[in-house]
């Protein structure tokens, strides 16, 4: 996959290096050309000097072929504008933006842009939002038989209760991250757009659970 990153600070450079190591092609945009030194001499991706929400700059970075876009510059407004341009003008499927003001998170979330306050951001968290495939194990019991994992959830689960998700997938939802905050859901909690679902499940059932989460809820007769 080709991935475009706006911002070559600590998170942006770490993200670019991690993605390249995973076999993705990467382009990094920054208005300060000296910031590219953080990438190191071994980085083989594109270095594009410019403003990350400028359409010509984005095209130079290969946004038209990109499967993901990360806005991790030092400015909230620049990040959200760039994220919206990537999604709305270029149709990039996986988009995430870093913000510094957590009070803005809900507004951005309504725009369909995953955001989390910067104190919680790490390159690893951004990686999971850009490449939402498969379960990310966060904890395993000593025997290795049970694990806690963040599982990518199909958007078709939005609007359905946690109880239905648990019943159809056979997992227990441990907690949900919503607008950057962890919540302990009840069986009546309804999944919202942008929720990150963390579940307890048997390690030998990971692939089955991933498939059920990706498939979405079963069709209901007469529903």
Swiss-Prot record:
Gene Ontology molecular function: potassium ion transmembrane transporter activity
Describe the location of the RCK N-terminal domain by residue ranges.
1-118
**Keyword annotations for this protein?**
Ion transport, NAD, Potassium, Potassium transport, Transport
Q: Which PROSITE patterns match?
A: RCK_C (PS51202), RCK_N (PS51201)
Q: Which InterPro entries match?
A: K_uptake_TrkA (IPR006036), NAD(P)-bd_dom_sf (IPR036291), RCK_C (IPR006037), RCK_C_sf (IPR036721), RCK_N (IPR003148), Trk_Ktr_HKT_K-transport (IPR050721)
Q: Which SUPFAM superfamilies match?
A: NAD(P)-binding Rossmann-fold domains (SSF51735), TrkA C-terminal domain-like (SSF116726)
All copies of domain RCK C-terminal, residue ranges: 133-215
Does the UniProt entry include the keyword Iron?
no
Q: Which amino acid positions bind NAD(+), per UniProt? A: 7-11, 30, 73-74, 98
One GO CC annotation, please?
plasma membrane
Q: Where is the signal peptide?
A: none
- Function according to Swiss-Prot or TrEMBL: Part of a potassium transport system.
What does the record say about domains? The RCK N-terminal domain binds NAD and possibly other effectors. This is expected to cause a conformation change that regulates potassium transport.
Q: Which PANTHER family match?
A: POTASSIUM CHANNEL PROTEIN 2-RELATED-RELATED, TRK SYSTEM POTASSIUM UPTAKE PROTEIN TRKA
Name-wise, this protein is Trk system potassium uptake protein TrkA
Organism, by scientific name, is Streptomyces coelicolor (strain ATCC BAA-471 / A3(2) / M145)
């Amino acid at each position: 996959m080709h991935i475009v990153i706006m911002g070559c600070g600590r998170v942006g450079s770490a993200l670019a290096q991690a993605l390249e190591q995973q076999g993705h092609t990467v382009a990094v945009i920054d208005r300060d050309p000296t910031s590219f030194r953080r990438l190191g001499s071994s980085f083989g991706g594109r270095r594009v000097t410019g403003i990350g929400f400028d359409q010509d700059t984005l095209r130079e970075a290969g946004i038209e072929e990109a499967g993901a876009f990360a806005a991790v510059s030092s400015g909230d407004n620049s990040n959200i504008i760039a994220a919206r341009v990537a999604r709305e003008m270029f149709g990039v499927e996986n988009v995430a933006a870093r913000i510094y003001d957590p009070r803005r998170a809900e507004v951005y979330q309504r725009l369909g842009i995953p955001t989390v306050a910067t104190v919680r951001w790490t390159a690893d968290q951004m990686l999971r939002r850009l490449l939402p495939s498969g379960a990310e194990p966060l904890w395993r019991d000593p025997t290795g038989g049970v694990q806690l994992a963040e599982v990518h959830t199909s958007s078709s689960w939005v609007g359905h209760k946690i109880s239905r998700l648990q019943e159809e997938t056979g997992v227990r939802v441990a907690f949900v991250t919503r607008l950057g905050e962890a919540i302990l859901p009840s069986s009546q909690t309804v999944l919202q757009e942008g929720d990150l679902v963390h579940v307890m499940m048997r390690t030998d059932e990971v692939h089955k659970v991933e498939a059920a989460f990706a498939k979405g809820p079963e069709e209901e007769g007469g529903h």
